[in-house]
Amino acid sequence: MIIRAPIRTKTKSFRGDQMDFKFPSNESLPRGTLEEYHLNNHHLLNDVFAAENGVSRDEDGNSQTLSDYTSTSNTNTNSGYSSNGYYSFANISDNTTSSPRIVINQNETARLTSSDSNKSDFFASHDFPGNDSLHYSSSNVVKNQLHSMEAIPEGNITGSISTAFQTIPTADNVSYDIAPSSASSLLPRKSTSKSAILPSTQEAKPMTKLNMEKDIKTIELNNSVVPKPKKKLNRVPTIRRVESSRFSNSRYSSSVSSKSSSSRCSLKRSKAIRCKGGLLYYFTSLGIKIKKKLRKLRLVLRRRLFSYNVQKVPSATNSKTTKSKANINNKSKKRGTNLVNKNSNSTPRQKKSQRYVSNLQRSISSKSLVPVLAPQKKTKPLTVDTKFKANHPQSEDSKVGSNTPRSPLVSYTPSLRRTNSSIRRAASILTASATMTPANNKNSFISVPDNVSHAVTRNSSMYSRSRLVRSKPSTALNAIARQPSIVVENKVIPLSMNRYSIKEEDEYVIDTSSMRELSPVNSVCSSDYDRESSESYSNYADAMETTEVDNKDRVECNNEIQNVDANNEETSNEESYNLMKHYLSTVIAQRIMLRVQIARIQNYKSNVVYMNKSAETNSTIYEDLVDSLLTEYEADGSSSQIFDGVTVRADEEEEEDEDDEDDEEEEEENDDEEDEEDEEDDEDDEEEEEKRKEGEGRNLAKEVDELAELSPMRKQSDLSITLRSPFAMLNPAYSNSIISLPTGVVKRSLTLPVGMKI
């Protein structure tokens, strides 16, 4: 039978990936096959009790004193005396916590150790004269070979009898004490519940000698009347209720009368269990211990914090006076303590707001849920020394001082306790934040493709991002029902409102255009098929039929192919290098020329040359440039002259450099002439300006003619370039490029965006 363990779903409120459900394999099952009879420990109690009292099987079915787990009256069991994997609610405590073992020695503290945790709680034991009867081991019980059920020790705190098969837990786990009539009638015994926990060493000191003598007398009476706790049960044990934690004494040493109101009462699960899991005694005792420790720690911290007003007296005789002074100063201190408490996070409400659990340490739930997102820092738990000195956890910010109380850093992880509000919150988080989570998030389990067509879903017309899209096929079973859901009482409740959890789509798209009818001859004996098969299987050879000759031939063929490819790459690289070199050199040369012309136009002294009209064309040089640009755009010009040839003459650059030098010298001479002209008359100035303008106009005309007369380069047939200009969209006449203009006409920068298609 496959038993599914309850697991968490992948909800955002629990901050973690979902645990993949796996069927139990042979590796995960425990080693060694145990029969169903040995898997529970209830048969040990029932069999021993039946052997003692001679109870028949018919009475077992109707008896309520037997274990509820293996009886026929239990509704959970399908068969008579066998278990089916379901635990009754009252018996969960027998399987969740291992019963603690106690060994009490003289003048030593008894250490209560449990196999579940590494914690150890210390209880002080009184000076027991000859308490060897309280020392238990499994060897004493094994000698009796389980012929009789031994009486539960009365003076012990929590005892357990270990057998060869399984540890028989006492009734302390289920908040009941089984008291035999002989012991209850002879002496008022101490209850083994939480109210009978022996006082600690710190509280044992202020007890008076009278209390110590009374305890010693009761223990001696116990040892004399009941010499050894090997008392047989001759009747049905009486069940006595345990006192609740509210009405227990502050010293926790009060005794409860052993006689109950009813001598025989049936075991009812509803009244026996006060908390989930049947761990009432464990949690109440743990809460009482932690409360006591926290109260003592609070007192110690108060003494250390607010002891600066109290005068320290070394002698012991003045201790009474210091106590009286401290009592007088307590009222005056209250205002200061209230101010400090307002600033510090020491009030319980502020601790609760900071998720500081003061009454319980939820160690099991915090260990089971390790946070995935935030790194967890290891901190020491809050412990108390025997000398009542607070152990502050060593932290980085220890510079604040040891006098300030520091609460331990509690790494909070949410528990698995599910309520109605938590279920609603998880559902709202899933439905609301599904549209906000990105697809590439590590923690998001919803994968949304980029090119999503807005499909009309059942709920809304927009595309819901919470829908699941098929991805890579996986062999895991959880890929089938990979949808947002919540587990409540081991039942998966889906949160998606869609009818189908997986988006219905075609996995295999068949192209109908490629389908054609095949005759039986063509389908089998087609020449295309033979050619394709020969090409696909040309490099194939069976591993058993390969020879060394075939390997040599393949190596030679591969080497030849690599050599041919390398040669082709070298030639193509050389061609591209030459083309780019030529292109860049021509562009740089044109930009140098354009910048020189722009500098001349922007110069206010030489700007008059471009704006004055010439006598031949009756227009300025600037207007001539614009006219040439417009005529070039309107005409069906040829392609650009940049790639007309691969080689570029070095004479062009030399001529441009010479032109630049001549222009600079002329400008300097003109500046000198202007300085001299300022001293002369106005008539001389006009004559000099006319001469200078004519000289500059001639030089500019010479440059334009030289650039226009450059011999065109030879064209390569294997390179075709089409250039597009932004004017082609408005008018097809402007389909040519800006770069295709003659170099002598272009007077502006070439940095305009140009789309180039090679």
Swiss-Prot record:
Record-level GO BP terms: maintenance of protein location; positive regulation of mitotic actomyosin contractile ring contraction; protein localization to cell division site after cytokinesis; regulation of protein localization to cell division site; secondary cell septum biogenesis
Polar residues composition bias: residue spans: 338-348, 355-368, 400-414
Domain of life: Eukaryota
Annotated Low complexity bias: 315-330
Modified residues (Phosphoserine): 25
Acidic residues composition bias: residue spans: 651-689
Basic and acidic residues bias: start-end ranges: 690-702
GO cellular component labels: cell division site; cellular bud neck; cellular bud neck septin collar; cellular bud neck split septin rings; cellular bud tip; nuclear inner membrane; plasma membrane
Phenotype of null mutants: Increases frequency of mitochondrial genome loss.
Entry's localization field: Bud neck
Triggers of expression: Expression is controlled by SWI5.
Residues forming coiled coils: 648-711
Entry keyword set: Coiled coil, Phosphoprotein
Main localisation: other
Record region (Disordered): 55-77, 314-414, 636-702
Note: Present with 238 molecules/cell in log phase SD medium.
Membership in a protein family: Belongs to the AIM44 family.
Protein name in UniProt: Altered inheritance of mitochondria protein 44
Phylogenetic lineage: Eukaryota, Fungi, Dikarya, Ascomycota, Saccharomycotina
